[in-house]
Amino acid sequence: MENLQANLTLIQQRLAAASDGKYPVPKLIAVTKTHPAEDILPLQNLGVTDIGENKVQEIMEKLPALEKNFRIHLIGRLQSNKVKYIIDHVCLIHSVDRLSLAQEIDRQAQKHNRVMPVLIQVSPCGEAQ
């Protein structure tokens, strides 16, 4: 845990230095994919508020232990048919890579009376992803 605290402090210092006091300090998202909930919970005591998971099934398995303690981000590719499972449980969906997915996110968010923030993935060269 001491190593984790030291690494986290170093990262936070680097983020603060990068913002140089002129910009907001970037939000740190601890990527917790593949780690069990019991290994993730101690991060709360270190001040971590946001975690990233890349699989819907993993989010759903860890949800009972983590949802009240962290803001959960979906990082990585999301299939349209799985949006309904996470729409009420994540704070941000990263890597929206196609219009049909954005439309499904919007459809499911409306059903749950919420607006879902997303990050759009674009290819500057027009390459298929």
What residues fall within each predicted segment?
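Conserved alpha/beta-domain cores
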Residues: 1-129
